[in-house]
Amino acid sequence: MRKILSILIIITLASCSKYQKLMKDGTPQEKLDAAKKYYGDKDYLRAQPLLEELLGLYNGRKEREEIYYLYSYSYFGTEDFLLAGYHFNNFATTYALSTKKEEALYMSAVCKFKKAMPTELDQTPTQNAINALQTFINQYPNSAYVSECNTKMDELRMRLLKKVYENAKLYHSLGYYNSAMVACQNAVEDYPDMVKRDELTFLMVDAAYLFAQNSITKKQLERYSETLMKVKEFNREFDTDSKYSKPVLKIKNKTEAAIAELNKE
């Protein structure tokens, strides 16, 4: 076992020594050949420094376009999507007449897609990714990448919808009823295809009732009236066979009773 380990160490050291010698003394062509080989082997960490140096060595020459193309992908290969996206976009600007411009712009949008954060975190990168993918589709409506862009945008939209839905429910569960009403209202208005739309509309009714119930007396009549307006909105949109129809009816009855009681005072 020790003998095998020793052999592996020797091979690794020899490989490192060869790479360092190439970086120090290799000709531009030798470095280019090696960079392509490392890239082909998906050894992006070794390919990247070579490609970066070659960008300067081949400045102004036709080979630089391919070098920059590989350099951009090397960052994508190491999952550094911030720099990959920057370089893909810069490639498209630098080589505006390149046959790879369309691909580079698509990959720049894909990098934004990859950077989009999980649902529980800030969704600004998610919206940025949707915008980037839509911009690509607008620019290249007949591109072979359009279908993939649409698939990715659908995934991102579902992520946004989930976040909006969870935020609205969280406000309600924490007792922030006014915030819950606003969040639910915004969700159903901004996202017509919102998942569990009927649940959010019900929560809006329930939050309106609880907000009125927990208000000071002089504010209650106005807020109970607003609750009845939310009830009407729910009934206009959803059939009586909705699983929330009965709970909404109960809220309506309790609200009307509360209004009647307040009017006696």
Predicted segments with their positions:
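Bacterial Sec signal peptide processing site at the extreme N-terminus
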Residues: 16-34, 261
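TPR repeat positional signature
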Residues: 31, 68, 105, 112, ...
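TPR-repeat structural position
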Residues: 44, 81, 126, 177, ...
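Short solvent-exposed coil/turn linkers within tandem alpha-helical repeat scaffolds
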Residues: 57-64, 92-101, 120, 134-151, ...
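Short coil/turn linking the two alpha-helices of tandem helical-hairpin repeats
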Residues: 62, 96, 113-121, 154, ...
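Extended amphipathic alpha-helical interaction segments
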Residues: 108, 127-210
